[in-house]
Curated annotation (Swiss-Prot):
GO MF annotations, alphabetized: metal ion binding; phospho-N-acetylmuramoyl-pentapeptide-transferase activity; UDP-N-acetylmuramoyl-L-alanyl-D-glutamyl-meso-2,6-diaminopimelyl-D-alanyl-D-alanine:undecaprenyl-phosphate transferase activity
Lineage of origin: Bacteria, Pseudomonadati, Spirochaetota, Spirochaetia, Leptospirales
Name of the protein this chain belongs to: Phospho-N-acetylmuramoyl-pentapeptide-transferase
Functional description taken from the UniProt entry: Catalyzes the initial step of the lipid cycle reactions in the biosynthesis of the cell wall peptidoglycan: transfers peptidoglycan precursor phospho-MurNAc-pentapeptide from UDP-MurNAc-pentapeptide onto the lipid carrier undecaprenyl phosphate, yielding undecaprenyl-pyrophosphoryl-MurNAc-pentapeptide, known as lipid I.
Statement: the UniProt record of this protein carries the keyword Transferase: yes
Organism: Leptospira biflexa serovar Patoc (strain Patoc 1 / ATCC 23582 / Paris)
This protein's record includes keyword Cytoplasm: no
Gene for this chain: mraY
Alphabetically ordered keywords of this record: Cell cycle, Cell division, Cell inner membrane, Cell membrane, Cell shape, Cell wall biogenesis/degradation, Magnesium, Membrane, Metal-binding, Peptidoglycan synthesis, Transferase, Transmembrane, Transmembrane helix
Domain of life of the source: Bacteria
Annotated EC: 2.7.8.13
UniProt-listed GO biological process terms: cell division; cell wall organization; peptidoglycan biosynthetic process; regulation of cell shape
CC per GO annotation: plasma membrane
Predominant cellular place of this UniProt entry's protein: membrane
Family: Belongs to the glycosyltransferase 4 family. MraY subfamily.
Membrane topology according to the record: Multi-pass membrane protein
């Protein structure tokens, strides 16, 4: 909204020029969403409790989780609400990809809400049928990625070097320039990234503050990458693809980071509220979509190493048990394995945060080391 105000009245009122600066709008988006979450978070928790939106803890989980039963869930609602408001206020709504990011977040939050509602209110064990949930996820992913490739166009141009690259090109960390043009496989690949990221974050959401803390590290890192990718001089200096308009993603990502920090205030141990699938599905899908838009799909494996490890641990555990009848881990996802190995919940979470920060530093280093 403020960007539109500047574009409409900036020539008449010079002080409105301040709203043209992406850095200012990004900071304000982060503060706006964070304060919305702070101010209304406690009221939302009371509201969720009154509606009996409570978490049911699995019986075969760690014994230390028994006291979590009854904790309100669907806390992702406050994050998607604050993100939407901050984006509408501070985002550049003439940038189609910013709108697509917001639409994607709302769709996946809606899917997660439906699943949470069926589990906590309707008391349907497991929530939505796995097949139904997977089909809806695929439909959302196909729609979003198709819209992205259709409206973004056939190519982007690095204006500084005159390098033309296709949006179907694949880039690798530490390698300068595209390594392979995916062609017709670009959309299926993007769909896999989107779905995989969504479910990986969903699996990570099992301890107080684990998912919210690790995701905010990733969103903040992507916000920096988005800003330099959309700034010609910075992209030229770092020899990375210049993506016109991508610096506007940093406003959206700053808003999401603020929402996550505000939510973490209530979600840290002992958690007053859980994000539920309402939060985890939209957070994961957003990371995947941003990676696609920034041409950092493979880099997401490094930045989101925690999420990858959690997902791989589940795949290995299930595969091993089906093939050999034996389990590799004491329990999957991976964070439960460490809990059953004697680590306290707080220790697992903080150590995973530390690893996430290290991975973020490595991710940022790839921008220059190539």
């Amino acid at each position: 909204m403020f960007q539109w105000i500047y574009e409409s009245f900036g020539n008449d009122y010079g002080f409105l020029r301040v709203f043209s600066y992406v850095t200012l709008r990004a900071m304000m988006a982060g503060l706006t969403s964070m304060f919305i979450t702070f101010i209304f978070g406690k009221s939302l928790i009371s509201f969720l409790l009154s509606l009996k939106f409570r978490e049911s803890v699995r019986n075969d989980g760690p014994q230390s989780h028994a006291n979590k039963s009854g904790t309100p869930t669907m806390g992702g609602l406050i994050m998607i609400l604050s993100l939407t408001i901050s984006t509408l206020l501070w985002g550049n709504l003439s940038n189609w990809n910013v709108i697509l990011l917001l639409i994607s977040a709302i769709l996946f939050a809606g899917l997660g809400f439906t699943d949470d509602y069926m589990k906590s209110v309707k008391k349907i064990k497991g929530g939505m049928r796995a097949r139904t949930k997977f089909i809806v996820t695929i439909l959302f992913a196909v729609t979003i990625t198709t819209l992205y490739f259709y409206y973004t166009g056939k190519s982007n141009v690095n204006l500084q070097k005159g390098i033309v690259f296709s949006i179907t090109d694949l880039f690798l960390p530490f390698v300068k320039g595209p390594v392979w043009n995916l062609g017709i496989f670009a959309v299926p690949f993007a769909i896999i990234v989107l779905i995989g990221s969504s479910h990986a974050v969903n699996l990570t959401d099992g301890l107080d503050g684990l998912a919210s803390g690790t995701v905010v590290i990733s969103t903040a890192t992507f916000a920096l990458i988005a800003y330099v990718s959309g700034t010609p001089s910075a992209a030229n200096y770092l020899h990375i693809p210049y993506l016109p308009g991508s610096h506007e993603y940093s406003v959206f990502l700053a808003g999401l980071s603020g929402a996550l920090l505000g939510f973490l205030w209530f979600n840290c141990h002992p958690a007053q509220v859980f994000m539920g699938d309402t939060g985890s599905l939209f957070l994961g899908s957003t990371l995947g979509l941003v990676a696609i838009m920034l041409k950092k799909e493979i880099l997401l494996v490094i930045l989101g190493g925690i999420f990858v490890a959690e997902a791989v641990s589940v795949i290995l555990q299930v595969g091993s048990f089906k093939l050999t009848g034996k389990r590799i881990f004491k329990m999957a996802p991976l964070h439960h394995h460490f809990e059953l190995s004697g680590w306290s919940e707080e220790k697992v979470v903080i150590r995973f945060w530390i690893i996430g920060i290290i991975l973020a530093i490595i991710t940022l280093s790839t921008l220059k080391i190539q």
